Amino acid sequence: MSKAGGNKGGVKTGGRGGAGSSNLQVRVKKKAGTIKESSRRWLQRHLNDPYVHKSRQDGYRSRAAYKLIEINDRYDLLKKGQKIIDLGAAPGGWSQIAAKIVGSTDENPHVVGIDYLHVDPLPGVVLLEMDFLDDEAPQKLMDALGDKPDLVISDMAAPTTGHRRTDHLRTVHLCEVAADFAISVLKPGGHFLTKTFQGGTENELLALLKQKFRSVHHVKPPASRAESVELYLLARDFKG
């Protein structure tokens, strides 16, 4: 999970079954007419997830925080003083980690997040409650940040339909929009990290990123559930 050298900025990390995990399994009983079987399974998995327990212990907004921690431990993306834009920020886990590592404060914010869902305030983070797909969103993000970002991160995913190919295509579209934005605003040498789903239709996106960045590859951090089709695309060293 972590590369040699350990944590950045004092951020805590956790592995599968790490501190706070337990062999005691929580079982969610189904009462007739009260909960769907699929919902019961999701709730039981959530309640028994060691990352969920650890996120509560460490004070993180969500288990997704560990995905960014683990990716950063491996690739050293986040550094003190950087400017960061977080797309699809709710509930705030990635913005929270980014602000802590880069040293963002309310007086001198270096992290701007955007989501159409409400995100409770976070220290050192400017939060925009609007849809990133709105025409005005890109300029509002840049105005709030006040400078070109060193890193654009996106954990956006379209609401799932249950149809794997449809879900993949909708999320790839969000990736493409996020990539276009990152390419238009990043500093030379900057990085772009975005969620995608396994599905094999992102060839055009990969070709674009390989043209604009010096290194592009897929990443699946340990905090991403093994059974999930979720992957991350990491594009490093923007050519400008």
From Swiss-Prot:
As its record notes, the protein acts as a catalyst of: uridine(2552) in 23S rRNA + S-adenosyl-L-methionine = 2'-O-methyluridine(2552) in 23S rRNA + S-adenosyl-L-homocysteine + H(+)
Q: Which UniProt keywords apply?
A: Cytoplasm, Methyltransferase, rRNA processing, S-adenosyl-L-methionine, Transferase
Where is the protein found, in the record's own terms? Answer: Cytoplasm
Statement: the UniProt record of this protein carries the keyword NADP = no
Q: Main location per UniProt?
A: cytoplasm
Give an example GO molecular function: rRNA (uridine-2'-O-)-methyltransferase activity
The membrane-spanning stretches of this chain are: none
Instruction: Give the CC-aspect GO terms.
Output: cytoplasm
Q: Does the keyword Lyase apply?
A: no
Which InterPro entries does this UniProt record tie to the protein? RNA_methyltr_RlmE, RNA_MeTrfase_FtsJ_dom, rRNA-MeTfrase_E, SAM-dependent_MTases_sf
The UniProt family comment states:
Belongs to the class I-like SAM-binding methyltransferase superfamily. RNA methyltransferase RlmE family.
Its biological purpose is as follows:
Specifically methylates the uridine in position 2552 of 23S rRNA at the 2'-O position of the ribose in the fully assembled 50S ribosomal subunit.
- Protein name listed in UniProt: Ribosomal RNA large subunit methyltransferase E
Q: Which organism is it from?
A: Brucella anthropi (strain ATCC 49188 / DSM 6882 / CCUG 24695 / JCM 21032 / LMG 3331 / NBRC 15819 / NCTC 12168 / Alc 37) (Ochrobactrum anthropi)
